[in-house]
From Swiss-Prot:
It comes from Dianthus caryophyllus. Monomer. Possesses high antiviral potency, but relatively high toxicity to normal cells in culture and to intact animals. Capable of inhibiting HIV-1 infection and replication. Allergy may occur upon exposure to this protein, which needs to be taken into account when considering it for therapeutic purposes. Expressed in leaves (at protein level). It is an enzyme of class 3 (hydrolase). Its EC number is 3.2.2.22. Residues 1-23 form the signal peptide. This is Ribosome-inactivating protein dianthin-30. The active site is at E200. Glycans are attached at N284. Belongs to the ribosome-inactivating protein family. Type 1 RIP subfamily. The lineage of its organism: Eukaryota, Viridiplantae, Streptophyta, Embryophyta, Tracheophyta. Gene3D superfamilies: Ricin (A subunit), domain 1, Ricin (A Subunit), domain 2.
């Protein structure tokens, strides 16, 4: 009888482990007493988590995202402030934001996610403190245009550029969604700033450097920032296929002037485009068109 009981327990444990998705790796940015060096280290943690150190594109030293994984799919980023923690969920294969977590005005954890970007089971693994009943699909899409529309920006060109960037602004936007009744406009504005201060800053050291230069103050964004954000795929493709030893085979213009050397782009992370034919040689020698998130 004992043998059958042990076998039954073992079978249940085995089934449970096969049904459960491993929790995502999480990194935390302390916003209670932030510093420029802490922010830079936070971005480096993101890059190091998703990069494949064996991939070298165009003979550069720019980190490259690894091939998509069927098991380790998501990354969790926590913004820890004096009023609590708000979290983002990112897809590791491209750093696209799929969900966020915040407390409501009754101090109940709630997770909000973009349609078709993450399953309920994956969301539970990403944000285990949120019960399934408190998972809610966002009413708008994950692309910048959809989020901007819901942010109801009325100044200038009505794009995210008009909101600015900066750590203090990020803190303000977090306070707008944490322990509050959900307001879609505040939520969308939080997402626009949080995405740019994490995923985009990890992709582009140019953006990171603007944040640290002005740290911790809010500063006006610029057209060049937006051009970088909509050109990640184009830049990655150019470095992957038309760059040798860090030099492009021709001048490239990604919307902010011609460049010939990849280092002038101040890239932080390149999109995964496969393994280049010359990757082994480069390794030895060195011993988007779509506006999406």
């Amino acid at each position: 009888m004992k043998i059958y009981l042990v076998a039954a327990i073992a079978w249940i444990l085995f089934q449970s482990s096969s049904w459960t998705t491993d929790a995502a790796t999480a990194y935390t940015l302390n916003l209670a007493n932030p510093s420029a060096s802490q922010y830079s280290s936070f971005l480096d943690q993101i890059r190091n988590n998703v990069r494949d150190t064996s991939l070298i594109y165009g003979g550069t030293d720019v980190a490259v995202i690894g091939a998509p994984s069927t098991t380790d799919k998501f990354l969790r980023l926590n913004f820890q402030g004096p009023r609590g923690t708000v979290s983002l969920g990112l897809r590791r294969e491209n750093l696209y934001v799929v969900a966020y977590l915040a407390m409501d005005n009754a101090n109940v954890n709630r997770a909000y996610y973009f349609k078709n970007q993450i399953t309920s089971a994956e969301l539970t693994a990403l944000f285990p403190e949120v019960v399934v009943a408190n998972q809610k699909q966002l009413e708008y899409g994950e692309d910048y245009q959809a989020i901007e529309k819901n942010a109801k920006i009325t100044t200038g060109d009505q794009s995210r550029k008009e909101l600015g960037l900066g750590i203090n602004l990020l803190i303000t936007m977090i306070d707008g969604v944490n322990k509050k009744v959900r307001v879609v406009k505040d939520e969308a504005r939080f997402l626009l700033i949080a995405i740019q201060m994490t995923a985009e800053a990890a992709r582009f050291r140019y953006i990171q450097n603007l944040v640290t230069k002005n740290f911790p103050n809010k500063f006006d964004s610029e057209n060049k920032v937006i051009q970088f954000q909509v050109s990640w795929s184009k830049i990655s493709t150019a470095i992957f296929g038309d760059c040798k030893n860090g030099v492009f085979n021709k001048d490239y213009d990604f919307g902010f002037g011609k460049v010939r050397q990849a280092k002038d782009l101040q890239m932080g992370l390149l999109k995964y485009l496969g393994r280049p034919k010359s990757s082994s040689i480069e390794a030895n020698s060195t011993d988007d068109t779509a506006d999406v998130l």
